[in-house]
């Protein structure tokens, strides 16, 4: 017979009765001296942390990444040097706008983030399933998210709010075309693609720099839902994507994605009619070919969702040697914001949590703060110092010098905005069925939207392709010709 496992308080003291509070007699009031009761209630009151302001609803899993082709000609990142190198990873998939317990069938971009625990420290890939974003400058990030979030007076999402914002933000048009395609309602997390959205810099041992974008392609294929299919699933189940991922891994049907890199030589940066570092612009595969990097396999579910999936923190600025951020204006803002939100949400020592802690050794002078549990014990907590046993800076890891483009500082309008050119490319690449789905999904979403807002959006759509605008206008009963004569 096995030894009985005692229920205890968080102080390790065994609990004799977990069913009844301590009272002053059978009919008297509860006693404040009941430590078991007070500890239990006080901890329950603090079980939750603030949910993420975006990407709150998520599912995650552990796995490994295997490098299939050496990337040493592009980057000195050690985990990408040799074929066959295995790196532990944790991946988190999410919806972007809606809350933690919202239906996973809602139209929304899907977050696609991967933490690589490399021997040189952590590397965070922080992307989405869709290859572009609504805005090109981080100063507009709070605005676009506010427009998509519920009305602060009614707590109800209102299409008038986000379509109003979109109509006055023409750079969002390409993202609209992806989001309101059926790719805005994926069938499962196992069947979504992933994109870095932003360009980054890779630097090799010779100091040569290239710009790159990264793409994840699911081996299961990209599978999406029509609006009708999503509604049918939502009527029965609003955890379908989390359940599918969990059950597939439990059953040994491990999902896999191939990672590809697209490469741009800096000397070619000005060779296009758009800015390749603009997050509202895609790098189409026929212009920027895919090169296979490796394969990710997810093979273990979290043991504790809160401690892992909910507490994991990502930042696109968490890069290893041989990688740097690009000058992308949206990316530059995210470099600050992502870690800042984790410090607010989880705490200043969130990187000490096991899910965030690197496998590589950590040695620095960052001490104390709220809830530190991996204390560094040396009495020397400053640098420079004269003690040989203390950690010292290593010039071998200084970031390579990078050319600065431009010599004027200020609030400058982005060059080559080309707000509709890539949207036109997307429209031209869509099949007849994909075009029909896009038009239908927009028309359906406009059922409660004011006519003046519809007209402003139709004017943007007209500048993408007159056929696109005319089909949406026909679906909403608007005479397009009355509103676009000045655009002809």
From Swiss-Prot:
SMART domains given in the database record: Catalase (SM01060)
EC number: 1.11.1.6
SUPFAM superfamilies: Heme-dependent catalase-like
InterPro entries assigned: Catalase, Catalase_AS, Catalase_clade1/3, Catalase_core, Catalase_haem_BS, Catalase_immune_responsive, Catalase_sf
Annotated localization: Cytoplasm
Superkingdom: Bacteria
Keywords on record: Cytoplasm, Heme, Hydrogen peroxide, Iron, Metal-binding, Oxidoreductase, Peroxidase
Region (Disordered): 1-26
Protein name: Catalase
């Amino acid at each position: 017979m096995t030894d009985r496992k005692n229920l205890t308080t968080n102080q390790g003291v065994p609990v004799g009765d977990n069913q009844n509070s301590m009272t002053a007699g059978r009919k008297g009031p509860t006693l404040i001296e009941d430590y078991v009761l007070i500890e239990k209630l006080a901890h329950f009151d603090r079980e939750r942390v603030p949910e993420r302001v975006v990407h709150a609803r998520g599912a995650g899993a552990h796995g490994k990444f295997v490098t299939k082709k050496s990337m040493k000609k592009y980057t000195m990142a050690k985990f990408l040097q040799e074929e066959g190198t295995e790196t532990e990873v944790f991946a988190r998939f999410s919806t972007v706008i809606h809350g933690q317990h919202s239906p996973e069938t809602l139209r929304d971009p899907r977050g696609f983030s991967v933490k690589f625990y490399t021997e040189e420290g952590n590397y965070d890939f922080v992307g989405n399933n869709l290859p572009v974003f609504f805005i090109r400058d981080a100063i507009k990030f709070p605005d676009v998210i506010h427009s998509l979030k519920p009305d602060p007076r009614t707590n109800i999402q209102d299409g008038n709010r986000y379509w109003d914002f979109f109509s006055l933000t023409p750079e969002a048009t390409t993202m609209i075309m992806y989001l309101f395609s059926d790719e805005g309602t994926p069938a499962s997390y196992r069947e979504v693609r992933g994109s870095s959205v932003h360009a980054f810099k890779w630097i090799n041992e010779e100091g040569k720099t290239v710009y790159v974008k990264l793409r994840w392609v699911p081996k299961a294929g990209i599978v999406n839902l029509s609006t009708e299919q999503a509604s049918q699933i939502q009527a029965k189940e609003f955890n379908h994507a989390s359940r599918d991922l969990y059950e597939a891994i439990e059953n040994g049907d491990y999902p896999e994605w191939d990672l590809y890199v697209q490469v741009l030589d800096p000397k070619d940066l000005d060779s296009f009619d758009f800015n390749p570092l603009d997050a509202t612009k895609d790098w189409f595969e026929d212009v920027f070919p895919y090169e296979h990097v490796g394969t990710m396999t997810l093979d273990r579910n979290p043991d504790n969702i809160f401690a892992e999936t909910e507490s994991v923190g990502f930042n696109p600025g968490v890069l290893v040697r041989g990688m740097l951020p690009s000058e992308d204006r949206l990316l530059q803002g995210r470099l600050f914001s992502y870690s800042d939100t984790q410090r607010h949400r989880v705490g200043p020592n969130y990187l000490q949590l096991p899910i965030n802690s690197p496998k590589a050794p950590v040695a620095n002078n960052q001490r104390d703060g709220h809830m530190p549990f991996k204390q560094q014990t040396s009495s020397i907590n400053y640098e420079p110092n004269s003690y040989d046993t203390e950690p010292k800076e290593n010039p071998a890891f200084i970031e390579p010098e990078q050319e600065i483009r431009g010599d004027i500082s200020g609030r400058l309008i982005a060059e080559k905005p080309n707000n509709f050119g890539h949207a036109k490319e997307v429209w031209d690449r869509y099949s007849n069925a994909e075009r029909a789905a896009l038009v239908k999904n927009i028309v359906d979403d406009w059922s409660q939207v004011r006519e003046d807002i519809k007209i402003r959006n139709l004017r943007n759509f007209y500048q993408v392709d007159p056929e696109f605008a005319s089909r949406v206008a026909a679906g909403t009963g608007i005479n397009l010709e009355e509103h676009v004569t000045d655009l002809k």
